[in-house]
């Protein structure tokens, strides 16, 4: 009788532990999005993006008469993404709207290079491809990144403020939104 109870307790504990471990492991179940600003940190398409950028707002700070770039990237550790498209909407500070003709979207292209040190090939960002119907429909291999760039341009007439908007990456019938923040400073 005691053996049956002990066996029942062991089986219950094993069932709870296995169910718990299955629900805790979530890495790679869905694509992750990353937001970051122009910096010296460039990431190749095979590199793991830093956790600090995951679901972070892509934030740029700029003065008047300047151009700055915010980056948004998507990656899925488990599966290939198809039909990947990038879009963005209006940016507003609640009072003013950032001029739409002063925002441009680009898809990052990557160049393959060889490292003599590591004796291996790697990729690094190479150029910006303007988004259009042809270039804005792509495939992202599993465990690779695809970055997109939003270039903002201010003029002397652009009102200072903190402009907020959304960028979206659609894929395989799904969609991920990420906040983009543009801080325009008037130093005159």
Tell where the protein language model's regions lie, with residue ranges.
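Bacterial N-terminal signal peptides that target proteins for export
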Residues: 1-10
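Sec-dependent signal peptide cleavage junction
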Residues: 17-26
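Extended acidic/polar, glycine-enriched regions
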Residues: 73-90, 135-188
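Bacterial N-terminal signal peptides
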Residues: 10-18
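Residue-level detector of short, conserved catalytic/binding motifs and their immediate flanks
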Residues: 13, 70, 165
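Contiguous beta-strand segments within globular domains
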Residues: 55-78
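Surface-exposed binding patches on compact interaction domains or structured appendages
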Residues: 25-54, 78-150
């Amino acid at each position: 009788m005691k053996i049956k109870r002990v066996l029942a307790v062991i089986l219950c504990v094993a069932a709870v532990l296995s169910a718990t471990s299955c629900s805790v492991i979530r890495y790679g179940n869905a694509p992750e999005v990353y937001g970051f600003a122009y910096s010296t940190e460039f990431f190749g398409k095979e590199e793991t993006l830093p956790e600090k950028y995951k679901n972070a707002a892509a934030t740029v700070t700029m003065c008047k008469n300047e151009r700055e770039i915010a980056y948004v990237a998507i990656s899925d550790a488990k599966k290939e993404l198809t039909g990947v498209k990038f879009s963005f909407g209006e940016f507003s500070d609640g009072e003013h709207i950032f001029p739409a003709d002063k925002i441009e979207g680009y898809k990052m292209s990557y160049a393959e290079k060889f490292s003599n040190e590591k004796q291996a090939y790697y990729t690094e960002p190479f150029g910006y491809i303007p988004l259009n119907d042809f270039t804005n429909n792509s495939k992202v291999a599993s465990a690779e990144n695809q970055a997109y760039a939003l270039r903002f341009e201010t003029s002397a007439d652009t009102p200072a403020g903190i402009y907020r908007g959304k960028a979206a990456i659609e894929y395989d019938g799904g969609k991920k939104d990420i906040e983009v923040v543009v801080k325009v400073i008037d130093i005159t």
